[in-house]
From Swiss-Prot:
It comes from Synechococcus sp. (strain CC9902). Pfam families: Ribosomal_L4 (PF00573). Residues 60-71 have a biased composition (Basic residues). The keyword GTP-binding does not apply. HAMAP family: Ribosomal_uL4_B. This is Large ribosomal subunit protein uL4. Residues 42-87 are annotated as: Disordered. GO terms for biological process: translation. Part of the 50S ribosomal subunit. InterPro entries: Ribosomal_uL4, Ribosomal_uL4-like, Ribosomal_uL4_dom_sf.
Length: 211
């Protein structure tokens, strides 16, 4: 079980919160998280790269020049891979890069990644609820009050991010906003600091704390 300080929108301490998740064994934790990240990155690939083989290249099957008497190497087709504009040998074809991973492994990897970043988590009560209009400066100042530098890669996790928060954050290159039900290993490990809403932390505990 890990304990976190809960802060309000002004950065002042507003209580305590706990997170108790079962993590993978130390011997297999790194490998488990690594496979989860590889799987997530592989699923981002479109797999639409395609080249033409000699049977698909435009052009007839005519012989470019006669078999003998030219002094050149013999050629049987203008579509051969040996000629410019010919087919491609062993080129890419559309395929799926998806990698399989058991559900229990995926959940264990996420829990392990989350607990590994527990020292970098800042729990905030009512994050952004006081915003009356979309203002990037308000988010930047709030992160500053939480002790997070402007050039830090930040992951903000909220249960249901409001439209005001979404529009205020989207102009910040170093800040990424996701909902608690879209939590993933890559984002958890990629960010330098994590800002988690108090209600989002409760949701995470409810969803992942039973295993």
């Amino acid at each position: 079980m890990a304990s976190c300080v809960v802060r309000d929108w002004q950065g002042k301490e507003a209580g305590k919160a706990t997170l108790d998740l079962k993590v993978a064994k130390e011997a297999s934790a790194v490998d488990l998280m690594h496979r989860a990240v590889l799987r997530q990155q592989a699923h981002m690939r479109q797999g639409t790269a395609s080249t033409l083989t000699r049977s698909e290249v435009r052009g007839g099957g005519r012989k470019p020049y006669k078999q003998k008497g030219t002094g050149r190497a013999r050629q049987g087709s203008v579509r051969t891979p040996l000629r410019p504009g010919g087919g491609i040998i062993f080129g890419p074809k559309p395929r799926s890069y998806n990698l399989a991973m058991n559900r229990k492994e995926r959940r264990s990897a996420l829990r392990t990644a989350l607990m590994a970043r527990i020292d970098d988590i800042t729990v905030v009560k009512d994050f952004g609820t006081s915003l009356e209009a979309p203002k990037t400066r308000e988010i930047t100042e709030a992160l500053g009050r939480l002790g997070i530098a402007a050039d830090t890669k930040v992951l903000i996790v909220l249960t249901n991010p409001s439209e005001m928060v979404r529009r205020s954050v989207r102009n910040l290159d170093k800040v990424k906003l996701i909902s608690a039900n879209h939590l993933n290993v890559f984002d958890l490990l990629h960010a330098n600091s994590l800002v988690v809403g108090e209600d989002a932390l409760t949701t995470i505990q409810e969803v992942y704390g039973d295993d």
